[in-house]
Curated annotation (Swiss-Prot):
<feature type="topological domain" description="Extracellular">
    <location>
        <begin position="649"/>
        <end position="654"/>
    </location>
</feature>
<feature type="disulfide bond">
    <location>
        <begin position="374"/>
        <end position="390"/>
    </location>
</feature>
<dbReference type="InterPro" id="IPR050726">
    <property type="entry name" value="mGluR"/>
</dbReference>
<dbReference type="GO" id="GO:0007605">
    <property type="term" value="P:sensory perception of sound"/>
</dbReference>
<dbReference type="InterPro" id="IPR028082">
    <property type="entry name" value="Peripla_BP_I"/>
</dbReference>
<dbReference type="GO" id="GO:0043235">
    <property type="term" value="C:receptor complex"/>
</dbReference>
<feature type="disulfide bond">
    <location>
        <begin position="563"/>
        <end position="576"/>
    </location>
</feature>
<dbReference type="GO" id="GO:0070905">
    <property type="term" value="F:serine binding"/>
</dbReference>
<feature type="topological domain" description="Extracellular">
    <location>
        <begin position="35"/>
        <end position="590"/>
    </location>
</feature>
<keyword id="KW-0597">Phosphoprotein</keyword>
<feature type="glycosylation site" description="N-linked (GlcNAc...) asparagine">
    <location>
        <position position="98"/>
    </location>
</feature>
<keyword id="KW-1015">Disulfide bond</keyword>
<keyword id="KW-0472">Membrane</keyword>
<dbReference type="GO" id="GO:0030424">
    <property type="term" value="C:axon"/>
</dbReference>
<comment type="subunit">
    <text>Homodimer. Interacts with PICK1.</text>
</comment>
<feature type="binding site">
    <location>
        <position position="230"/>
    </location>
    <ligand>
        <name>L-glutamate</name>
    </ligand>
</feature>
<dbReference type="GO" id="GO:0005509">
    <property type="term" value="F:calcium ion binding"/>
</dbReference>
Length: 915
């Protein structure tokens, strides 16, 4: 009892849970009272060195019963794998020569508390019993049979069982090597310092499963875990790694409760809960065999064949038993298990086991009944659901299905790892000793642990067996998919592997009904090209899709960005492309009309000019003022020419000519007309005051005045050239519409609207001034001068330009600005030139060509007579007319012989007075 109290203090300092202490004390108390009888269900094999073994030979029993049905694969296969490995090692002269390995193998019944109670058997030899007060009937002290010393333990299977057992074994410094426990917390070398395993931890497995899920394009999954360390810690690792990897969301994390009376209801509720998130079709499972079987059955009851996409951990692996009668629900399931190979020697060994040659396995008879569905005649048979008698002649693999269980390889590797450690320890401590020397006998578990962590050999699968500083094996996994259709061999198919990185053969995968296309398990379908994701708060894998609008393109899946200034989005808005460059084309309707008018005007102007040159010395041509007439015709011609410059493809030369000729044609035209109207006005104003002719009315003076007016325009253009040299630009604002598809860059000269108005402003000023003079000279007789035709010309021109201004500026924001403004400007200039050409020149050309009899010189008058006649005409114009058409018209000129001396003497020259 003293030893028990000491152990209690030690366990208390280790902060064991109260329930563990209670179980431990009860078991130790029984051992201390001298109960040396071994449990009826255990295997004991004599040897120089004894290894412990923990295997889930039976499933959990119902409430109140420790053990349930026998587990043929996970239990018996694994247990026999240890016995097979012991046989191989004991028969190997090169491994532990002269040393025989024994074993003490116990059943954990897949329950951690029961396994803890059973594992106390391993520490009995290390507990010193106080027998001072115990005497036999003869007064002699009792003789106790000392239990064999267990130097190391192989097991356990479930992580929760291994954790419970590891807590007690570390107290007695007994090394432990597991063949199936993968819980990440067992990697904590401070808490489980005597624990090692030949399988990788779930942290590697979880990483592999995350990689699989991401490779299949699934970003919205649910997790399902059996209650306990393996399931809960596995899901915890998966969740943590998925968060670190990003792009993967957990829809639901469901835990499968244990120790419930009616578990069928629980599994039906779990399936219903998983269906609450229908888009989360992928379900990552960290569960034991029984829970996997029950969850598949519940899914089948819910008629969800083909809905769930199962991703199973190594507890599912490539096992057949959990899928029995639920193959349709499991079709397409992806499972993972540590990389392994079939141990052929074990197959031969196991299939040769019979009731006669395998009496050392105390559970083999029960396995025989379950495997062959028969009943043995021996008492204590548990097979009550059949009347078929076992003959003992049945053979495994012939009379029953047989497939090597997935963890057999790792059981063998675990036993060999312990054997290699003992071998090296024996060589170091017992170099000159055959068998187990006293030094090795007295060596503690810490020393053996050191040798275990340093082993490195090729295991039964040909892969290296080694441990890192935490006692973990490297991560190497095979990836399987359960396939039943379109295959000659239904079952698990190897589709990839994971060794630090994923290698997955997606082309070998298939899903329900043989479908090859990977089904979706996403919260929201991927956005279309040109749309960005707008995630929902708290669920980054769920989003709404928002189109990139305007001039934005999809920069990445979360962001829309504006295209550069000179680009627009491409058709699907996944990038940008250059905005097309346009200019006013010759074939455009906007250009055809101005060009047509300009060509007609140029032809007419050339015709008029040719006519005037041909009839240069005729009275009408001379009377119209030949010098200014040619100047005016030049201006009209330039007004037509500017149309071609405005439509031509812009370059530096074209832009230079545009600047020069844009206002020059109008300036020349209106400078000549202004000079004419000003001369008329001054002549008649001067005539009212005196008979002396005004100054500067000679042709030379008129040309000088006109030239000076034109030079102002040219000076302004030269200043413009100096301040802002001609250049071409591409204007992207002018044609940047709301719809990017219609956006265009306009190739044009670097001339702003304001500069155009400034260039035309001087000409417009001349036009307005000329109009004012035309109004003032409106009373001059029409046959005497050109004042009235000039007046009509200016009135019409003003109307044209008054219409031009609102059209030009009113379309400044229009997408058709280039076309409208260019067309408006050129047509306005064409109309202005045509009005002047038509009103001032066409009547004269008509007379010259069709009525040459009227093209004669009229009688000359003195300057005073001209003025007096004009004054009288102005007065008579207010009196009623006796003519039929009501005209108040006075003929001031008579036909006279110009060569008569009287004419030369009494009259001034007509040519000097007629305007």
């Amino acid at each position: 009892m003293v030893q028990l109290r000491k152990l209690l203090r030690v366990l208390t300092l280790m902060k064991f849970p109260c329930c563990v202490l209670e179980v431990l004390l009860c078991a130790l108390a029984a051992a201390a009272r001298g109960q040396e009888m071994y449990a009826p269900h255990s295997i004991r094999i004599e040897g120089d060195v004894t290894l412990g073994g923990l295997f889930p030979v039976h499933a959990k029993g119902p409430s109140g019963v420790p053990c349930g049905d026998i587990k043929r694969e996970n239990g018996i296969h694994r247990l026999e794998a240890m016995l097979y490995a012991l046989d191989q090692i004991n028969s190997d002269p090169n491994l532990l020569p002269n040393v025989t390995l024994g074993a003490r193998i116990l059943d954990t019944c897949s329950r951690d508390t029961y396994a803890l109670e059973q594992s106390l058997t391993f520490v009995q030899a290390l507990i010193q019993k106080d027998t001072s007060d115990v005497r036999c009937t003869n007064g002699e002290p009792p003789v106790f049979v000392k239990p064999e010393k267990v130097v190391g333990v192989i097991g356990a299977s479930g992580s929760s069982v291994s954790i419970m057992v590891a807590n007690i074994l570390r107290l007695f410094q007994i090394p432990q090597i597991s063949y199936a426990s993968t819980a990440p917390e067992l990697s904590d070398d401070r808490r489980y310092d005597f624990f090692s395993r030949v399988v990788p931890p779930d942290s590697f497995q979880a990483q592999a499963m995350v990689d699989i899920v991401k490779a299949l394009g699934w970003n919205y999954v649910s997790t399902l875990a059996s209650e306990g360390s393996y399931g809960e810690k596995g899901v915890e690792s998966f969740t943590q790694i998925s968060k670190e990897a990003g792009g993967l969301c957990i829809a639901q994390s469901v835990r499968i409760p244990q120790e419930r009376k009616d578990r069928t209801i629980d599994f039906d509720r779990i399936i219903k809960q998983l269906l609450d998130t229908p888009n989360s079709r992928a379900v990552v499972i960290f569960a034991n065999d029984e829970d996997i079987k029950q969850i598949l059955a519940a899914a089948k009851r819910a008629d969800q064949v083909g809905h769930f996409l199962w991703v199973g951990s190594d507890s599912w692996g490539s096992k057949i038993n959990p899928l029995h009668q639920h193959e349709d629900i499991a079709e397409g399931a992806i499972t993972i298990q540590p990389k392994r190979a079939t141990v052929e020697g074990f197959d031969a060994y196991f299939t040769s086991r019979t009731l006669e040659n395998n009496r050392r396995n105390v559970w083999f008879a029960e396995y025989w009944e379950e495997n062959f569905n028969c009943k043995l005649t021996i008492s204590g048979s548990k097979k009550e659901d059949t009347d078929r008698k076992c003959t003992g002649q049945e053979r495994i693999g012939k009379d029953s299905n047989y497939e090597q269980e997935g963890k057999v390889q790792f059981v063998i590797d675990a036993v060999y790892a312990m054997a290699h450690a003992l071998h090296h320890m024996n060589k170091d401590l017992c170099a000159d000793y055959r068998g187990v020397c006293p030094e090795m006998e007295q060596a503690g578990g810490k020393k053996l642990l050191k040798y275990i962590r340093n082993v490195n050999f090729n295991g039964s699968a040909g892969t290296p067996v080694m441990f890192n500083k935490n006692g973990d094996a490297p991560g190497r996994y095979d990836i399987f998919q359960y396939q039943t259709t379109n295959t000659s061999n239904p079952g698990y198919r190897l589709i990839g592997q994971w060794t630090d990185e994923l290698q997955l053969n997606i082309e070998d995968m298939q899903w329900g009904k043989g479908v090859r296309e990977i089904p979706a398990s996403v919260c929201t379908l991927p956005c279309k090209p040109g749309q960005r994701k707008k995630t929902q708060k708290g669920t980054p894998c769920c989003w709404t899709c928002e189109p990139c609008d305007g001039y934005q393109y999809q920069f990445d899946e979360m962001t829309c960005q504006h295209c550069p200034y000179d680009q627009r989005p491409n058709e699907n808005r996944t990038g940008c492309q250059d905005i097309p460059i346009i200019k006013l084309e010759w074939h455009s309707p906007w250009a055809v009309i101005p060009v047509f008018l300009a060509m007609l005007g140029i032809i007419a102007t050339i015709f008029v000019m040719a006519t005037f040159i041909r009839y240069n010395d005729t009275p009408i041509v001379r009377a119209s003022g030949r010098e200014l007439s040619y100047v005016l015709l030049t201006g009209i011609f330039l007004c037509y020419i500017i149309t071609f410059l405005m439509i031509a493809k812009p370059d530096v030369a074209v832009c230079s000519f545009r600047r020069v000729f844009l206002g020059l044609g109008m300036c020349i035209s209106y400078a000549a007309l202004l000079t004419k109207t000003n001369r008329i006005y001054r002549i008649f104003e001067q005539g009212k005051k005196s008979v002396t002719a005004p100054r500067l009315i000679s042709p030379t003076s008129q040309l000088a005045i006109t030239s000076s007016l034109i030079s102002v325009q040219l000076l302004g253009v030269f200043i413009w050239f100096g301040v802002d040299p001609p250049n071409i630009i591409i204007d992207y604002d002018e044609h940047k519409t709301m719809n990017p598809e219609q956006a265009r860059g306009v190739l044009k000269c670097d001339i702003t609207d304001l500069q155009i108005i400034c260039s035309l402003g001087y000409s417009i000023l001349l036009m307005v001034t000329c109009t004012v003079y035309a109004i003032k000279t409106r009373g001059v007789p029409e046959n005497f001068n050109e004042a009235k035709p000039i007046g009509f010309t200016m009135y019409t021109t003003c109307i044209v330009w008054l219409a031009f201004i609102p059209i030009f500026f009113g379309t400044a924001q229009s997408a058709e600005k280039l076309y409208i403004q260019t067309t408006t400007l050129t047509i306005s200039m064409n109309l202005s030139a045509s009005v002047a050409l038509g009103m001032l020149y066409m009547p004269k050309v008509y007379i010259i060509i069709f009525h040459p009899e009227l093209n004669v010189q009229k009688r000359k008058r003195s300057f005073k007579a001209v003025v007096t006649a004009a004054t009288m005409s102005s007065r008579l114009s207010h009196k009623p007319s006796d003519r039929p058409n009501g005209e108040a018209k006075t003929e001031l000129c008579e036909n006279v012989d110009p060569n008569s001396p009287a004419a030369k003497k009494k009259y001034v020259s007509y040519n000097n007075l007629v305007i």
